[in-house]
């Protein structure tokens, strides 16, 4: 399956299908976590399923000169694609929480506008959007104003390490996760920048035996480290967190490349690609869909698999509807004038 060369966002970043597949896998893991498939699964996926999205964001980060893109323009574009959906879906879920579910409590609205890593109405996953926005802005500013690569690395390391412990101060807007996200973005940026060097090319195109060996080591270390939760600032052993997040992401990229190669043009491959492409809708609406479906079934494994299947189907339909209609403004996509009059 060939790489699509179409522009995917205002930053002129090309879509790479194996990365959309990887996003799709990450989204499915996130939804499974919200359905709850047990502590063992939760420990496994939590080690990397949120870090991977920051790494992917860094992978596609492109250096821009002041003439190409001002700092204000960058912040505005990121606000459009991350903060606009954050606020729209956050208020949407609050209205359901308040008027339909009858919870006459304004605390979730307060949390939406402040300490959003807990207490949101229905869609707790929205914290990720504010964290990703802040991480992108910080990373852009560092890239724009710090030109020495070694000083840049030191600054990013200090921010990332500080982020591992910042939650002790309970900052608003998931700031601790954003600080860690800056470090994860730099990992993604370096993977992309040096992907054609011998060492990084080897890591991103593992043969079967190295792939299995690294998988075994990573899974073992994930369970050695135990519980990780970026939202709450829980990392257990920070060194193991950074290794596991990076190694699992590298393995995920390898797996996605293999899926693209083996299942090219199949329904499975196309489905994963579209989940990845429409991932923001899945992030914003999955918990509402899960809650609705969970009302009608009990918690046995078979029913959880049914909830997962129907959730993916419903979210897929909703995402296509939003992206293909004038509603796409709620996910930060522009609406052309002709779309409003025809």
Give the positions of each predicted feature.
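Alpha-helical transmembrane segments and their immediate juxtamembrane cytosolic regions
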Residues: 2-342
């Amino acid at each position: 399956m060939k790489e699509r060369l179409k522009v995917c966002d205002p930053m002129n970043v090309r879509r790479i299908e194996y990365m959309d597949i990887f996003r799709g896998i990450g989204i499915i893991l996130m939804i499974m976590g919200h359905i709850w498939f047990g502590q063992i699964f939760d420990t496994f996926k939590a080690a990397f399923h949120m870090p991977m999205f920051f790494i992917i964001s860094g992978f596609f980060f492109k250096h821009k000169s002041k003439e190409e893109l001002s700092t204000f323009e960058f912040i505005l574009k990121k606000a459009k694609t991350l903060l606009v959906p954050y606020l729209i879906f956050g208020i949407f879920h609050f209205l359901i929480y308040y008027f339909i579910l009858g919870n006459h409590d304004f605390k979730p609205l307060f949390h939406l506008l402040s300490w959003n890593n807990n207490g949101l109405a229905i869609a707790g996953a929205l914290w990720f959007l504010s964290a990703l926005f802040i991480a992108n802005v910080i990373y852009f500013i560092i890239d724009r104003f710090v030109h020495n690569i070694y000083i840049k690395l030191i600054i990013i390391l200090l921010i990332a390490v500080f982020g591992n412990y910042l939650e002790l101060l309970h900052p608003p807007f998931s700031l601790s996760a954003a600080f860690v996200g800056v470090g994860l973005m730099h990992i993604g940026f370096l993977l992309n920048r040096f992907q054609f060097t011998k060492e990084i090319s080897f890591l991103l195109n593992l043969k079967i035996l190295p792939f299995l060996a690294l998988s075994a080591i990573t899974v073992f270390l994930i369970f050695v480290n135990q519980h990780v939760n970026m939202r709450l600032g829980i990392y257990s052993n920070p060194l193991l967190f950074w290794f596991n997040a990076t190694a699992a992401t590298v393995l995920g990229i390898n797996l996605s490349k293999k899926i693209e190669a083996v299942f090219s043009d199949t329904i499975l491959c196309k489905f994963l690609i579209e989940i990845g492409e429409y991932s923001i809708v899945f992030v914003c609406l999955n918990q509402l869909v899960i809650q609705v479906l969970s009302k009608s079934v009990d918690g046995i494994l078979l029913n959880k698999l049914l909830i997962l299947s129907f959730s993916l189907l419903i979210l897929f339909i909703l995402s296509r509807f939003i992206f293909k209609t004038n509603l796409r403004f709620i996910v930060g996509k522009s609406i052309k004038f002709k779309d409003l009059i025809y």
